[in-house]
């Protein structure tokens, strides 16, 4: 039995979504796959599931009743620590495999279970990564339900309403700094700033407004406006303390051949995303600045079993 799930790009709204603001994401065509077969004891890639690198897999196993121990094989094309939802993709693919062994998979159930896994492992978190990996395509997260509601997730008096949103087919250039940063501490540091710094709290609210304006610009195919909003979103994320000199270097390099660029994901390293109609030139610009660059495209398929 096997299942796969996509990585994700947050186009607008990372960190602000934790505080109930809007965020916009899309699944991308880099996927994680998890294969399972019966075995005398639980194993992951031949090793113990107690190894720290399998903490998401182990927490996912605890969510699903299985008939017995399994040998799991994890294959992921989503680079770890790059801000592209690698842990969410592996978590969702693991849950998809485990549920699939019972007969069928349900994206809503898996999205909720995967969010609980990430919350347990990371601490304070939002469901945007795990819901995008579960549903595929474009997702808009709002504090209140509107049209095209997929599901609602609640935790600790907070509520996120996940909506399907139709985005035009888009290619994005990713610039990976090669610097990894743990999501949990970054989220905790932003929380501390927002609770004690009025400017940080206002930045979070502005990011929420930018997200809705950015969605409108993308729907109108106004890439110039969308790029400007990405640039502003990056500046606000830097104000929240999740920037890094290498992120700024790659953003500046990418902007010379694109409509706009910003960090994507938790920050502190990881990746930048650029909106460009000259992707080959943007890739070269990022590489010249010291980053690893590649092009991804939106993926409409979420969690799915493999034949």
Region locations from a protein language model:
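Glycine-rich nucleotide-binding loop
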Residues: 267-269
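C-terminal nucleotide
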Residues: 1-12, 16-17, 25, 33-66, ...
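Active-site-proximal alpha-helical scaffold in enzymes
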Residues: 88-103
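N-terminal pre-triad scaffold of radical SAM enzymes
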Residues: 72-81
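Short, conserved phosphate/pyrophosphate- and ester-handling motifs at nucleotide-, phospho-/glycolipid
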Residues: 87, 265
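Short, solvent-exposed loop/turn segments at secondary-structure boundaries
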Residues: 22-23, 48, 83-86
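Short, flexible loop/turn motifs enriched in small residues
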Residues: 28
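Short aromatic/hydrophobic contact patches that present stacked aromatics
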Residues: 83, 271-273
